[in-house]
Amino acid sequence: MTTTTERPDAPIRHDWTVAEIQAIYDLPLLDLVHRASLVHRAHHDPADIQRASLLSIKTGGCPEDCAYCPQSAHHKEAGIGRQRLMPVEAVLREAEAAKAAGATRFCMGAAWRQPKDGPEFDAVLAMVRGVRGLGMEACVTLGMLTPSQAERLAEAGLTAYNHNLDTGPDFYGDIISTRTYADRLNTLQAVRDAGIGVCCGGIIGMGEGVADRAAMLQVLANHAPHPESVPINALVAVAGTPLAERPPVDPLDLVRMCATARIVMPKARVRLSAGRRALTREAQVLCFLAGANSIFYGERLLTTANNEADADAQLLRDIGVPVPGIEVLEAAE
């Protein structure tokens, strides 16, 4: 009997069970990647791998206690102090440079529990308007939002709001105690209600089981519509955080997550995000084959190191993906 996982043109579903998703995740890897690739090609151009740039516009001092995050004020040994919000002009200069290097999406992150209405939130709105004025997609991650804040971001032209679930509901309490799962879901609903695209994914390698990974994907896949984009992150274990001693993620687990996300959310952009620096070129290509179609471009992801831009450009060239921004810059030299 043909199942939905075997049909790349199957109807979009919003009624997945955790057991169904875990069964997909646990398929023999070659079968899983093949099925995911068929779904991917039915809904996306395989040569379209978006390059997004991510900038920390306000670093450190976050009151949340996320066990993986060096920006938490609870993890002082991580050595990241509280910094002020960057000036609007400085952020837009970074956006211009990212665009010149070929990025089409500019993401801005602030280490807040929730933004306060006032001058700083107004500055973020100006940043969003400025990025959109450059012809780029704009995404921000600012913590929890009120409905009115989401509406103001929508009016400023925000393309997407990032607010990750991090993990499945049952494991969540082992990672974070200062914000509930319901808090996260409420922010996602406010974003949807404002008409902003949802960017929402999670992190693997924090000690969760496969069932927790499947449960996180189930929450995402049962939203209607599916998230506009789904970042898949591998833990970057940072000294001074509670997860500093976690072992590295098996690259094939990252491939499985990308493939499973692609199958259950066929039209979403699957973003191969944090932890990519630890992958070989071949492992990255396998993730692309399995349905990942975005990377973060630039040598930092908030406060952790990322792949070198030149190496990324060469990898994309080698697999036949156009990299117009880099080619324009090289032609001008």
From Swiss-Prot:
Q: What is its EC number?
A: 2.8.1.6
Keyword 4Fe-4S in annotation = yes
- Tell me one GO molecular function of this protein: biotin synthase activity
Please give the NCBIfam families that the UniProt record associates with this protein: bioB
Partners and quaternary state?
Homodimer.
* Protein family (similarity comment): Belongs to the radical SAM superfamily. Biotin synthase family.
Q: What is this protein called?
A: Biotin synthase
**What gene makes this protein?**
bioB
